[in-house]
């Protein structure tokens, strides 16, 4: 869950949200966080009541029947497919930057952008997706170990960023607070919502959790 929430979204979408909301992006994070917290509480309650694998599919099946559960299941497949593509593209930017700065190799734009962005194919994104797929194939223990390491790296990076940024905060940088008004803040909140998504992955482990009625909500 932590690995999914503290992921590509918080690193990549922050710049996009800043363009929409400016300093008001702070309010966007709060709005998106409150909405996600409400959804997360629902997931926690359902996971405690129906402690089996399947997440939203199982909850829909138990409450509304097979047809709705079937629709939710396919919606989840679409969601995870789109999310995997978005995360792969986000990591692609980091891979390209690393290759260009560390090895001084310039990759043609046609090979790092999809057709929608004027390129042919995003090879780094495909490589990232293939690597993650390979980790999942070789075993849960190995992929969990890699995920734990990556979570540690991401949390450390955020902690270092906060420690370095707080001493140089100037209130002049927060004026104007919302250059595009509430419309910009709400648009940024919609983008930032993706950065919080991942709490639903926690509920999938309810069946393997000891005392899920107590531990899942926590």
Question: Residues of each region from the PLM?
Answer:
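Membrane-water interface regions at transmembrane-helix termini and the short interhelical loops
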Residues: 45-47, 71, 75, 114, ...
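Residue-level recognition of pore/gate-forming positions within transmembrane alpha-helices
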Residues: 4, 32-36, 76-77, 151, ...
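Extracellular loop-to-transmembrane helix junctions
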Residues: 10-113
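The first (N-terminal) embedded transmembrane alpha-helix
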Residues: 1-10
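Hydrophobic alpha-helical transmembrane segments of multi-pass membrane proteins
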Residues: 2, 30-31, 74-82, 127-134, ...
